[in-house]
Amino acid sequence: MPESADPRDRLIVALDLPDVEAAERLVARIGDAVTFYKIGYRLAYAGGLDFAARLAKSGKKTFLDLKLHDIGNTVEEGVRSASALGATFLTVHAYPQTMRAAVRGRGSGLKILAVTVLTSYDDADAAEAGYALPVADLVARRAEQAAEIGIDGIVCSAAEAGAVRHRIGPSGLIVTPGIRPAGAEAGDQKRVMTPGQARAAGIDHVVVGRPITGADDPRAVAQRIVAEMEDA
């Protein structure tokens, strides 16, 4: 399992906020307690990509959670554009053609993460979408394909981390959303763990959103999560 020199890097705060101004306020409140931020669709479409570039220039790490999935050339060029923003991580859907294109476009500084199955999905959701395999088997199969193609890491729930690690080896990254501190509500995530449980399961980075962004003291919550992972 890859180790970061800075334990704060293990926590990625999801900036699922309505606009850049709200994101700027949150980042200022958290200060140096957090080094890594995730920007998804909501903020990306509201000026978040320029904000991501500014974060990167200020020394923060950024995770563009855009889940690219398109024809190969479009994905390849999109990945190159993300790399130019100074992003550290970028997500693509774990389809072989998409992953191969992303690897071609990533350059030297960007790491590509494959999204196997959304953590809001359970077996019933997978069946409804037409998949014959249960979620755990689907995640394992896609992780194996990603490793063969040369993807840097996998996004999966903590429940699947052991199976994923077996398939991607010790050097691959595992990034896990659906992380909730003890006592927090699960929200729309169906496969969740606490930060300490996730770290003990071999997770490299955990993604936490509402428990931090909605807290009265987001800096303190972030610090507790980092400490919990260090103690695991």
Curated annotation (Swiss-Prot):
Which top-level enzyme class is recorded in the Swiss-Prot or TrEMBL entry? Answer: lyase
Q: What is its EC number?
A: 4.1.1.23
For the ligand (substrate), the binding residues are 16, 38, 65-74, 119, 180, 189, 209-210
Q: Which residues form the active site?
A: 67
The record lists the catalysed reaction(s) as:
orotidine 5'-phosphate + H(+) = UMP + CO2
The pathway to which it is assigned is: Pyrimidine metabolism; UMP biosynthesis via de novo pathway; UMP from orotate: step 2/2
**What SMART domains has UniProt attached to this entry?**
OMPdecase (SM00934)
A biological process (GO) annotation for this entry? 'de novo' pyrimidine nucleobase biosynthetic process
Keywords from UniProt, A to Z, are: Decarboxylase, Lyase, Pyrimidine biosynthesis
Q: Which Pfam families does this chain map to?
A: OMPdecase
| InterPro entries documented for this protein | Aldolase_TIM (IPR013785), OMPdecase (IPR014732), OMPdecase_AS (IPR018089), OMPdecase_bac (IPR047596), OMPdeCOase_dom (IPR001754), RibuloseP-bd_barrel (IPR011060)
Q: What is known about its subunit structure?
A: Homodimer.
Q: What is this protein called?
A: Orotidine 5'-phosphate decarboxylase
Q: Which organism is it from?
A: Methylorubrum extorquens (strain CM4 / NCIMB 13688)
